[in-house]
Amino acid sequence: MEGNAKIEAQDTCNVNERFLMMAAVDCPSLGRVKGQWYKAVPPLVRCHTGLTPADYFGRTLVERLPDNIKVGVVNVAVGGCRIELFDEENCEEHIASQPEWLKNTVKAYGNNPYRRLKELAVEAQKAGVIKGILLHQGESNTGDKEWPQKVKRVYENLLRDLNLQAKDVPLLAGEVVHADQNGRCASMNEIINT
């Protein structure tokens, strides 16, 4: 859910004050400090990432909620990664086998994206209630029949580490681009939907 789409002027204006993002990294060029809340003006992930599915998901959610409800997102993402990157116990081994660009990207998260997500989610719980977990990942795991179990492990670890219950905090997993839209990884949707 890192966001590859180019951020256009229309994406940076009219963001509702009730839609917030917690900075996952320090971003001096945007005046953002890791662990602090800001109005959710893109980029929501790191200093130079693009538009993410969370951008308009959050905006739409805020529009449909009562005026006294805020929506906050904590977005820790690495575009092009496999779900194994978020397996806290095995991520070091996984990172060691990855290309340099990925190794450099995860440095922004202290070389452990899961740990950073957990750290920020604990901080977010001080300001509100976690109501759901969004996942948009799968292209790099295309064809991996074990993907649902790997995602389940990450989800269950988050629930455990944050003292959450699955009945209260659903996991919402998005599909990848469909075949009729020239999605090269469209076959993964069958696995995502299991």
Language model region names:
Residues 1-194:
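Cell-envelope and extracellular/periplasmic
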